[in-house]
């Protein structure tokens, strides 16, 4: 009976020690926190400029975002994707190809949506880079 009590005490001690090792969750990062980082702020500005048809401004902001060091591989891939779109639509096909390759390099899961991949200007370039 004594060995059962010792085993129970050891088990309780181990559980107590393990409970002390649990790392409390950090506070979640919100959009407003991320939007204040220079690289992420430049990415958002570039995406807005692109959506507004301000392609030279979008190109500048997206390059600035990449230079400033976007933390997320998905964010870097998004910046490269928008740059690829800009380059393809302005006839800079080699630069477009390079941006699609860079997007895939930063995020191996990178893929255009079906609608994006079907675009007449950058769709064929994207398909060629995927081979």
Roles of regions detected by a PLM:
Residues 15-39:
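Bacterial Sec signal peptide processing site at the extreme N-terminus
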Residues 1-23:
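Sec-dependent bacterial lipoprotein signal peptides
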Residues 72-76, 105-121:
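Boundary/linker segments of alpha-helical solenoid repeat arrays
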């Amino acid at each position: 009976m004594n060995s059962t009590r010792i085993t129970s005490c050891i088990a309780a001690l181990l559980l107590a020690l393990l409970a002390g090792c649990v790392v409390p969750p950090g506070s979640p990062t919100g959009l407003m926190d991320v939007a204040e980082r220079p690289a992420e702020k430049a990415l958002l500005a570039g995406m807005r400029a692109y959506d507004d048809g301000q392609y030279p401004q979008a190109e500048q902001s997206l390059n600035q975002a990449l230079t400033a060091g976007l933390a997320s591989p998905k964010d870097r891939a998004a910046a490269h994707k928008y740059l690829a779109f800009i380059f393809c639509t302005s006839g800079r096909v080699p630069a477009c190809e390079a941006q699609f390759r860079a997007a895939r390099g930063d995020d191996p899961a990178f893929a255009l949506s079906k609608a994006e991949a079907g675009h007449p200007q950058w769709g064929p370039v994207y398909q060629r880079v995927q081979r």
